Amino acid sequence: MKVLNLYACLGGNRLLWDNCEVTAVELDPELARLYQERFPNDTVIVADAHQYLLDHYKEFDFIWSSPPCPTHSRARYWGFGANGKKPIYPDMKLYQEIIFLQHHCKTKYCVENVIPYYEPLIPAKKRDRHLYWTNFKLPNSLSDRHFEGISQTKNEVTKLCEFHDYDFRKYKGNQVLNKIARNLVDYEAGKTIFDTARGIINKKDTKQTSIFDEL
């Protein structure tokens, strides 16, 4: 199974994927280096993920995209005015990719982002702290792990290192460390979504069928 992992960051979503051939696209060279170190068998490409999707979407069996979330986040909106922050336009690449995939992608896909400060322009599936746009059904619960409360702790980065099973302090680039750590998808949620897309969850089992939402 060929998988495209866009805006791959450090591969939080990808950690528990197995039996697949992954191409990861990340624009930040330092994140790409650490991703390759973490997943040496993946193909890692330093490039614009938005353009890469347009050029290569037909080559994969499953596509995961996590476009940058800061311009959509409630935290950024609530922080307006603090420390001289000015309002900014939401980055519409998120919705460009959703619309493009909805109309042109024949394989399974998942677009992930934060819950925004506005009403989502395209209906999504809300799970925990994230929204997901998919062309397949998702279980009502993606993970038994709980992130809540970590961001309020004094040792936030340390707690996030423990939660994601990764030492984020390896990162020596220009991005803010705790933001990178906060934005990583829970690896159990990533596995549940991937396994669902691949059809591992048996939808003929009535116990499984009952946990699926309608598209």
Map each language-model feature to its residues.
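Class I S-adenosyl-L-methionine
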Residues: 25, 52-62, 69-215
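SAM cofactor-binding core of SAM-dependent methyltransferases
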Residues: 1-53, 64, 72
